[in-house]
Amino acid sequence: MADLLSSLKNLPNSSGVYQYFDKNRQLLYIGKAKNLKKRIKSYFSIRNNEITPNHRASLRVQMMVKQIAFLETILVENEQDALILENSLIKQLKPKYNILLRDDKTYPYIYMDFSTDFPIPLITRKILKQPGVKYFGPFTSGAKDILDSLYELLPLVQKKNCIKDKKACMFYQIERCKAPCEDKITKEEYLKIAKKCLEMIENKDRLIKELELKMERLSSKLRFEEALIYRDRIAKIQKIAPFTCMDLAKLYDLDIFAFYGTSNKAVLVKMFMRGGKIISSAFEKIHSLNGFDTDEAMKQAIINHYQSHLPLIPEQILLNACSNETLKELQEFISHQYSKKIALSIPKKGDKLALIEIAMKNAQEIFSQEKTSNEDLILEEARSLFKLECMPYRVEIFDTSHHANSQCVGGMVVYENNAFQKNSYRLYHLKGSDEYAQMSELLTRRALDFAKEPPPNLWVIDGGRAQLNIALEILKSSGSFVEVIAISKEKRDSKAYRSKGGAKDIIHTPSDTFKLLPSDKRLQWVQKLRDESHRYAINFHRSTKLKNLKQIALLKEKGIGEASVKKLLDYFGSFEAIEKASEQEKNAVLKKRN
């Protein structure tokens, strides 16, 4: 405690970020402050050189403070910089006591550029800095279904490069376009179609009515398969905003955020109102073993959502709960980010309070539906058996695949909320000379990406204790807290024993080795994760091998033999690089003597 006491006595009065560590140098918490000295000292009570938690703090904070052995600070110019740095470090390092929300992906917007002669609806996630652009959204889902419907219902220009081609295409022949490329429609006539398109984007009911008419016409012509496509699309568009009953007389543009939860679980609901109508909504489930702080979670939710420059910003942001201090910080952050004043408030009456109540009602409903499943019980049992500090809500599983150390590849699969998240899977081409070097490269590349994609609760490695130790070393050097287990086949005569029916899996943790019965649900859970990563990696290896064989065949046709192909690969690194190289460069490599 001498180090901690010394640090507490020499704190700066500057703005910055502070980090708390336990006696094992494990990161406990990251926070930010306008005045580091004032903020950090508020956690502690110091009497006669004895440090104790501030008795006015919450039980969650007091529990954390009892574990603090060291602290570090990072000084910045101002509170805005501190807020942004704090959020970035939390996502990258994932401290034990911070609430970690998923990175808020920018939702898509539909836009039309009326500065062009023939505007068409398109999707964007970025601001297009040009006059005449009209945005609609954000859409948490269904944007593509709306876009596809508009192009099928209206004779719009179907492709961005159509006008440049100066020649009517197949869409004109099937009466899906009026061929402005050949001046078969005037700008004024086309603008009427574009305005009708706008009306359909703004009025979902009108769009659905047009789709229903189209579906009925197809059914009457016995074109049932096409009619089914429209039926499914109507269902998707109807689900875009489940709160469309909320239609206010005042044309508010509002974003609404509401949290509901207990000490270790919560739900965040986001609703987006444009022109007095709720146009879309989304929710996120949050888990935390070390307590839930609404203020901290709200702060991270707002920063995650607004730190990217969004095309449309509301005039006001409504929250269900937040301290005055955090509310002020967030308002300054957003106003600074978008160079205009945007109000954040916690409504107490009227229409805006009713909106918060609807968001809360939905958060409560989603929360109540999350019953404890068998999978949750298995997770809890696995956590207890493997002595994991955190519940493995998000798991990343790694495997490598190669043939005689050629076509070396690796795969990462992700398991979250009791399901495989295929959108988060990653593939890697590897250069390692053996399975250990390949796993080291795979894990290192993932760790280097923690700033962009925050680390999970748990890594599962397909391998033995050697691979487990490689993972632990990489995580230690990254400064991130991720727990690790590995699963391998038992060995006989120093080789993995894989005879059918005889292979037994062994689970390795940093402190133990487990040989569980095949019927053990905890073993089966880890096996399920391992098998998916193995399937993913080996499929990538096979496709890579097939692609390489085709490339070798093409090179052979050009008179380049296998030995020469190997020489070129060793030098250029890939077939793509060989293709890009000039004949002179390739000849120079082939003429070199080893």
Swiss-Prot record:
Molecular function GO terms recorded: DNA binding; excinuclease ABC activity
Record flagged with keyword DNA repair: yes
CDD domains from the UniProt entry: GIY-YIG_UvrC_Cho
SUPFAM superfamilies: C-terminal UvrC-binding domain of UvrB, GIY-YIG endonuclease, RuvA domain 2-like
Domain GIY-YIG intervals: 13-99
Single GO biological process annotation from the record: SOS response
Ranges where the UVR domain occurs: 205-240
Domain of life from the UniProt record: Bacteria
Subcellular location as annotated: Cytoplasm
Main location: cytoplasm
Keyword terms, alphabetized: Cytoplasm, DNA damage, DNA excision, DNA repair, Excision nuclease, SOS response
GO CC entries: cytoplasm; excinuclease repair complex
Role played: The UvrABC repair system catalyzes the recognition and processing of DNA lesions. UvrC both incises the 5' and 3' sides of the lesion. The N-terminal half is responsible for the 3' incision and the C-terminal half is responsible for the 5' incision.
Homology family: Belongs to the UvrC family.
Complex and partners: Interacts with UvrB in an incision complex.
UniProt protein name: UvrABC system protein C
Organism (species): Helicobacter pylori (strain P12)
